[in-house]
Curated annotation (Swiss-Prot), chain A:
Descriptive protein name: N-acyl-aromatic-L-amino acid amidohydrolase (carboxylate-forming) A
InterPro entries named in the record: AspA/AstE_fam (IPR050178), Aspartoacylase (IPR016708), AstE_AspA_cat (IPR055438), Aste_AspA_hybrid_dom (IPR007036)
Keyword match Phosphoprotein: no
Sequence similarity: Belongs to the AspA/AstE family. Aspartoacylase subfamily.
Topology with respect to the bilayer: Peripheral membrane protein
Pfam families attached to this UniProt entry: AstE_AspA_cat, AstE_AspA_hybrid
Uppermost EC category: hydrolase
Taxonomy of the source species: Eukaryota, Metazoa, Chordata, Craniata, Vertebrata
Organism field: Danio rerio
Gene: acy3.1
Catalytic reaction(s) noted: an N-acyl-aromatic L-alpha-amino acid + H2O = an aromatic L-alpha-amino acid + a carboxylate; an N-acetyl-L-cysteine-S-conjugate + H2O = an S-substituted L-cysteine + acetate
Summary of subunit composition and partner proteins: Homotetramer.
Curated annotation (Swiss-Prot), chain B:
Cofactor(s), names only, from the UniProt record: Zn(2+)
Top-level EC class: hydrolase
Listed name of the protein: Aspartoacylase
Residues holding substrate: R65, N72, R73, Y166, S167, T168, T169, R170, E180, Y290
Classification of source organism: Eukaryota, Metazoa, Chordata, Craniata, Vertebrata
GO CC list: cytosol; nucleus
Family designation: Belongs to the AspA/AstE family. Aspartoacylase subfamily.
Keyword Nucleus assigned: yes
Cofactor, how bound (note): Binds 1 zinc ion per subunit.
Known EC number: 3.5.1.15
The keyword Transport belongs to this UniProt entry's keyword annotation: no
General function of this protein: Catalyzes the deacetylation of N-acetylaspartic acid (NAA) to produce acetate and L-aspartate.
């Protein structure tokens, strides 16, 4: 095929998508995940200093859970990042409603309303994890070309840490995370970082990822064609809990030193998972090789999760470009 | 010339305690103490009783550092002598109870040795914390532990600073020893950190058993880091931090910090340098619990402490 014909072929294969209206950058959805808290504060300071023109597209900054941020806790009453399903968003608010349910509905009004035509195009929800996950982009759908292209872009541009894409594959109304309020929203998860700590290296990665996301949206809206191709993603399959005492439910083992910090490695049958306090190794019994992630996340002990397991998938995304009146 | 005349004869250490959960989200000590409360076989030694104990059970239950106030700052003379039990913050009540069970602080009936188990988000490795440069028993014990742990490094932090020293839970004992192992996030149990702490305690109890059995320990020296100064984060007029520990300093506990070295990085990318006249050795770099105590790190200086030979005093 000649170069001209190939170019024409690509142009014809492009998917035309509407321009994106802007992005909401949300930090402090969990009040002790500090990169996002400080990044949002820094962005608000920049806006005060230099005006809205500091970014080439409209940017809204949100401190999602201000009470939890003030107390440097994950949440006050309940995990806010589980409050955005259609069911919880439509729960009537009473005096005894958990703070986060109330606040989730406020955010839904501000950034949504989820499911309507009026929603924000993009939410970037900023999170940290105690797990060694580098930069992980989390999205609830496996077929959103805009989000997948942004992920692809971040993967090419960010080289300091591994950049991986995790898809949860929920129908949107069941998706319970903050970013599901928007059309193309995703979570920016950076680790490892302890709760209540801001590490400069982690902050810098998160800032770079937000800047590149804004950059992509601006380029896309300005007519850049983003070439299609393959995107490797990890799809959530199941969770695994710690070994526990049947009566007290106390832990009887810790994540094995050979698994600790090896997020997204390939885990095969027989590989060590846990080292018990009495010195025994608990090994993997899964039939098929899977990839563990969120290994030893501090907030997941109370959820009964030592790590999640994922399958690797290759998705193919088409070339995309912005819809203009000519190409509509 | 033998050093026979320079042997210090000390009282045997019959009553030993291991405290976990002084901070309810520092998991290694909590798991170890609970494990040994269930089954004390591992910590049994001839010639001594060793009591494992959870010092702040309500904080442990909520997996939080403290309920009302930091227990590890609560053992002040004012607190310990306070009355009106019901009106006191939870941790002050607890301090009084612990002082009654394991003290009284400064009294002849107090426990001989208390090991207080802590974790830190700082990259301090295995650290033993001492409150006195003249406690021969403790100096000989940490010397023994360091030798036994080698080639794994055990650093020794000495906090004898009149203003920066604080009233710790372990201070009710005659010989208080802090164990600080990191890095480990709050609320997380890392296997390697857990096992290091467990091994340190094994060697510590071995030492006490040998000592109580009449073994003489020859004179020794101990390399320590002596606490000098607390360094806070740069803050704005509202008290909010405006910079983070610089990537060049992050995780470099115990390494020299020289004049002109990067110290902080502002959120908008500017580097702030260390301007002190002398080389210092920072530690507790970026400990999560110290943001509210206005501490980004502490500076230390290196010192060599000498300890006489010791052996158990004959009755």
């Amino acid at each position: 095929m000649t170069e001209e014909k190939a170019e024409e072929k690509n142009k014809m294969a492009s998917v035309f998508l509407p321009a994106l209206g802007g992005v909401a950058v949300c930090g402090g959805t969990h009040g002790n995940e500090l990169s996002g808290v400080y990044l949002v504060q820094e962005m608000e300071r920049q806006r005060k200093e230099r005006g809205d023109g500091v970014w080439p597209i409209p940017v809204t900054t949100v401190l999602s859970n201000p009470r939890a941020v003030k107390e440097c806790r994950r949440y006050i009453d309940t995990d806010m990042n589980r409050c955005f399903s259609k069911a919880v968003l439509s729960t009537p608010i009473t005096d005894s409603s958990p703070y986060e349910v109330r606040r989730a509905q406020e955010l839904n009004n501000l950034l949504g309303v989820k499911g309507s035509d009026d929603v924000m195009d993009m939410i970037c929800d900023l999170h940290n994890t105690t797990s060694n996950m580098g930069l992980t982009l989390i999205h609830y759908s496996a077929s959103d070309w805009v989000t997948l292209h942004i992920c692809k872009y971040l993967q090419t541009k960010i080289t300091k840490v591994p950049v991986r894409v995790l898809v949860l594959d929920f129908p949107i109304n069941d998706a319970y995370n903050l970013e599901s309020v928007s059309k193309h929203g995703f979570t920016l998860e950076v680790g490892p970082q302890p709760q209540g700590v801001v590490r400069a290296d982690i902050y810098v990665i998160m800032k770079e990822a937000v800047d590149l996301t804004i950059d992509w949206i601006h380029k896309f809206n300005s007519g850049t064609v983003f070439e299609g191709g393959d995107v490797e993603v990890f799809k959530f399959i199941k969770s695994v809990d710690y070994p526990r005492d049947p009566e007290t439910r106390n832990l009887t083992a810790a994540v094995h030193p050979q698994l600790q910090d090896r997020d997204f490695c390939l885990l095969k049958r027989g590989d060590p998972l846990f080292l018990s306090f009495s010195g025994e190794t608990v090994t993997c019994e899964e039939e098929e090789p899977l990839h563990p992630f969120f290994i030893n996340e501090g907030a997941y002990y109370e959820k009964g999760i030592a790590f999640h397991l994922a399958k690797k998938w290759t998705l193919t995304v088409p070339s995309v470009q912005v819809q203009t009146t000519n190409s509509a | 010339m033998s050093s026979r005349t320079n042997i210090s004869c000390l009282q045997e250490a019959k009553r030993v305690a291991i405290f976990g959960g002084t901070h309810g989200n520092e998991m290694s000590g909590i798991v170890l103490a609970n494990m040994w409360i269930q089954n004390a076989t591992e910590i049994e030694r001839k010639g001594l009783v060793c009591k494992p104990f959870i010092t702040n059970p309500r904080a442990v239950e909520k997996c939080t550092r403290y309920i009302d106030t930091d227990l590890n700052r609560a053992f002040t003379p004012e607190n310990l002598s306070a009355s009106e039990l019901e009106a006191l913050p939870y941790e002050v009540q607890r301090a009084k109870e612990i002082n009654q069970m394991f003290g009284p602080k400064g009294g002849s009936d107090a426990y001989d040795v208390i090991f207080d188990l802590h974790n830190t988000t700082s990259n301090m490795g295995s650290t033993l914390i001492l409150e006195s440069s003249t406690d021969l028993f403790n100096l000989q014990m940490v010397h023994y532990i360091k030798k036994a742990m080698a080639p794994h490094t055990c650093s020794v932090l000495l906090n004898e600073h009149p203003q920066l020293k604080y009233s710790t839970t372990r201070s009710v004992a005659k010989h208080p020893v802090g164990l600080e192992v990191g890095p480990q996030p709050q609320g997380v149990l890392r296997s390697n950190v857990f096992e290091s702490m467990r091994t340190i305690l094994k060697h510590a109890l071995d030492f006490i058993e040998l000592f109580n059995n009449g073994v003489e320990f020859p004179p020794c020296t101990v390399n320590v880091f002596r606490v000098q100064e607390r360094m806070d984060y740069p803050r704005d007029t509202n008290g909010n931090i405006t910079a983070m520990v610089h990537p060049h300093l992050q995780d470099c506990d115990w390494e020299p910090l020289n004049r002109g070295d990067p110290m902080f990085l502002t959120f908008d990318g500017r580097t702030i340098l260390y301007e002190g006249a002398n080389t210092v050795y920072p530690t507790f770099i970026n400990e999560a619990a110290y943001y509210e105590k206005q501490q980004a790190f502490v500076t230390t200086c290196r010192e060599i402490l000498a300890a006489n030979a010791i052996r158990k005093a004959f009755k």
